[in-house]
Amino acid sequence: MVERLVANEKVEGSNPFARSIRNMEKLYKKKCVACDGNTLPFDASEIHKYLKKIDGWEVKNSNQKNYYLEKEFKFQNFLESQKFINKVSSIAEQEGHHPDIFFGWGYAKIKILTHAIMGLAESDFVLAAKIDQI
């Protein structure tokens, strides 16, 4: 069974889109940091705090503890999906943080977690924000 968490945030101000962009930019500017495996994965409250800073990503798990980020992107055709995946791959190499990628005709699905801790850490949200900048 897969659980899903989605940010349920009260939007303040008259322009929620601008607020969302400001939140993403803060994460986008950060660098992914390698995890040595001794770091604890984020708990639910930390996950919710960071989830508010990225748009359209869902937090899922398959066994009640190993949370991961997931987002599906839609495209006009296979080639556009492939171009997007190539850009994601380039960012992943630059950051040293590699998501699981699934794609086909008209879609790409990205799954992000920190494999060393089998959960979520700040770098996962940083990578998600960087991918959203494509």
Which residue stretches match the model-derived regions?
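Short, Lys/Arg-enriched N-terminal segments with co-localized hydrophobic residues
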Residues: 16-23
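Short, low-complexity, intrinsically disordered N-terminal modules
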Residues: 4-7
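Long, contiguous binding/interaction regions
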Residues: 24-79, 86-107, 111-134
